[in-house]
């Protein structure tokens, strides 16, 4: 293959940066993650990184938007054609599957921390974007569940508890998870 045909396009690199940023921000938070670390994970120089994104905040916003989009994708794919309780059960099972993808859930948690910190510093750009994305996710869930704000609130609260337990490091076999119901129809092993 010619060397030029192996090169990634700027859009492919941008996608790589977003994926790498989600991992790094999930692990170290907004303030604890350097653009150098993200560039290294992607295999590009920092100057090239800044050709793709104007700065760290733009990278974080793109990663946060992707995180919310991927959460909806999980809900949407698992509950396609369903509404009401059937949709809630399907989406809940699918979200429990994300417990194994700690970076996805921790990116959500880091987003909330970053919003709080940016507002404390009187720089609300991250907060505005996060609230818009979260509201869109909430509304999509509300509609899929049948339109009730109460049902959507209960569903989202369930998800936040999952995020909290993951952030606290409870292993999946800990008794704290028992209230979430069986993930399969199989009987537990003796």
Predicted regions and their residues:
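Generic detection of well-ordered alpha-helical segments
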Residues: 11, 15, 19, 65, ...
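Short, intrinsically disordered or compositionally biased N-terminal tails of bacterial proteins
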Residues: 1-4
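Short, Lys/Arg-enriched C-terminal cap helix and immediately downstream tail that follows
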Residues: 61-62, 72, 146
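Hydrophobic alpha-helical connector segments
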Residues: 62-65, 75-103
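Short alpha-helical scaffolding segments that buttress acidic/His motifs in well-ordered protein cores
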Residues: 95, 108-112, 155-159
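Hydrophobic/aromatic-rich alpha-helical bundle segments in the mid-to-C-terminal region
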Residues: 119-190
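Amphipathic alpha-helical segments used for helix-helix packing
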Residues: 87-88, 100-121
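Helix-turn-helix
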Residues: 13-16, 20-58, 62
């Amino acid at each position: 293959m010619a060397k030029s045909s192996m090169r990634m396009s700027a859009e492919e690199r941008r996608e790589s940066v977003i994926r790498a940023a989600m991992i790094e921000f999930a692990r170290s938070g907004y303030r604890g993650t350097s653009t150098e670390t993200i560039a290294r994970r992607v295999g590009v120089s920092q100057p090239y990184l800044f050709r793709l994104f104007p700065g760290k905040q733009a990278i974080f916003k793109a990663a946060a938007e992707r995180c919310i989009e991927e959460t909806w994708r999980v809900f949407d794919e698992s509950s396609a054609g369903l509404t009401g309780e059937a949709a809630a059960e399907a989406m809940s099972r699918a979200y429990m599957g994300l417990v194994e993808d700690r970076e996805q859930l921790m990116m959500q948690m880091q987003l909330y921390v970053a919003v709080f910190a940016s507002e404390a510093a009187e720089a609300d750009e991250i907060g505005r974007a996060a609230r818009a994305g979260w509201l869109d996710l909430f509304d999509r869930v509300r509609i899929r569940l049948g339109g009730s704000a109460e049902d959507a609130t209960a569903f989202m609260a369930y998800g936040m508890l999952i995020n909290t337990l993951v952030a606290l490091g409870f292993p999946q076999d800990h008794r704290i998870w028992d209230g979430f119901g069986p993930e399969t129809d199989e009987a537990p092993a003796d």
